[in-house]
């Protein structure tokens, strides 16, 4: 199930179109896509299966934050489930002696894991809703610049509605890929 829906967007904005339209769903989808592009992964919990190569370090960089490790194989040999540790999108293996295992360059690793969040953090959901509401408000207009003139003072105020201003608030969940 999508973490941002047409119904949730309508409730967030307080707008309930009289005619049946799919535009709110389009805005919700576009906002979810923008969030995924910014984070570099879809924040909803899902299963991943990846093949990676060791690089001489003690951690493997995965494409999404790890929720649980389902299986790991090294050079085709299944590994015991114990000892695997993760922080954000980094996976490590702690040996019985307490040391972290080094994954030599050229070692082939296959990792199956659950990545993302269930539920999606509220700040990510709110950011997606803010973007979707912005798309809805700006329909047929220019979302880059809106201005207001004050007749008495001759002052003009410009508001810049770049997506980045909203997306910056979810930076703590952003990951950078290999």
Which role does the model predict for each range below?
Residues 1-178:
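Divalent metal-cofactor coordination and adjacent catalytic microenvironments
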């Amino acid at each position: 199930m999508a973490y941002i829906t047409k119904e949730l967007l309508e409730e967030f904005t307080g707008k309930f179109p009289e005619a049946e339209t799919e535009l709110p769903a389009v805005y919700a989808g576009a906002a979810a896509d923008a969030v995924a592009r910014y984070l570099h992964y879809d924040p909803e919990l899902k299963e991943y299966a990846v093949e990676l190569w060791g690089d001489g370090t003690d951690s493997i960089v995965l494409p999404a934050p790890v929720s649980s490790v389902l299986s790991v194989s090294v050079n085709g040999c299944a590994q015991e489930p114990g000892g695997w540790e993760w922080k954000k999108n980094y996976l490590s293996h702690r040996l019985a002696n307490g040391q972290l295992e080094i994954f030599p360059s050229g070692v082939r690793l296959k990792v199956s894991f659950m990545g993302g969040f269930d539920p999606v953090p509220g700040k990510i959901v709110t950011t997606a809703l803010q973007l979707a509401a912005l798309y809805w408000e700006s329909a047929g207009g220019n979302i880059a610049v809106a201005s207001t003139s004050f007749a008495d003072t001759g002052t003009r105020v410009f508001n810049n509605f770049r997506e980045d201003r909203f997306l910056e608030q979810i930076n703590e969940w952003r990951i950078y890929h290999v």
